[in-house]
Amino acid sequence: MTQPNTQTTPNDVPAAAEGQQEQQQQQRRGGGRERRGGGRRGDRRGQERDSEWQERVVQIRRVSKTVKGGKKMSFRAIVVVGNERGQVGVGVGKAGDVIGAVRKGVADGKKHLVKVPLTRHNSIPTLSNGRDGAANVLIRPAAPGTGVIAGGSIRTVLELAGIKNVLAKRLGSKTPLNNARAAMVALASLRTHKETAKERGISLEQIYS
């Protein structure tokens, strides 16, 4: 009785090896597509989140620091970040170049965001006052169509917060950073009428009366 020949010929070995190599290459390509696809989706989500925010540079100054070897020069950037829907922040960044300072300022501003209660006319609910150092900023609500009556860094903060009708007055220091931070303090102290009534333990009718 003859036994079947199970020995592989020299011509069969390269063909089997080539088939395995093709399968491995296809698996690598498929995995690469999945990874690349996931990376693109993640990048798109990140870009959409970043597109919600606007940043404006208020001031860029060249500053120096005295060290053991002499003076070390760098740049300081004051940046205001906001989404024009009630969130705004002021950041400061220092770096050896302007681009690096602005990038750090944007990151610092996003770490110090303030939620601003907006009315249906894109104004603020009540009058507010804020101080920072020698700067004193007074902001008050305005009627629809008034616009943003403010100047300098205060105007930038109010616009990026999404406030369309407001009156602001600067009292004291003219320093852009102090004024921007004073405006942030004033916005952070704002409360809606419901929150004010709850804190005082009274009804909304008593507030309006």
UniProtKB/Swiss-Prot annotation:
GO cellular component labels: small ribosomal subunit
Cystine pairs: none
GO MF annotation list: rRNA binding; structural constituent of ribosome
GO biological processes: translation
This protein's UniProt keywords: Ribonucleoprotein, Ribosomal protein, RNA-binding, rRNA-binding
S5 DRBM domain sequence ranges: 53-116
InterPro entries on file: Ribosomal_Su5_D2-typ_SF, Ribosomal_uS5, Ribosomal_uS5_bac-type, Ribosomal_uS5_C, Ribosomal_uS5_N, Ribosomal_uS5_N_CS, Ribsml_uS5_D2-typ_fold_subgr
Superkingdom, taxonomy of origin: Bacteria
Regions of compositional bias (Basic and acidic residues) in chain numbering: 31-55
Residue stretches of biased makeup (Low complexity): 18-28
Domain notes: The N-terminal domain interacts with the head of the 30S subunit; the C-terminal domain interacts with the body and contacts protein S4. The interaction surface between S4 and S5 is involved in control of translational fidelity.
Assembly with partners or alone: Part of the 30S ribosomal subunit. Contacts proteins S4 and S8.
Family: Belongs to the universal ribosomal protein uS5 family.
HAMAP family: Ribosomal_uS5_B
Protein name (database record): Small ribosomal subunit protein uS5
Organism from which the protein derives: Prochlorococcus marinus (strain MIT 9313)
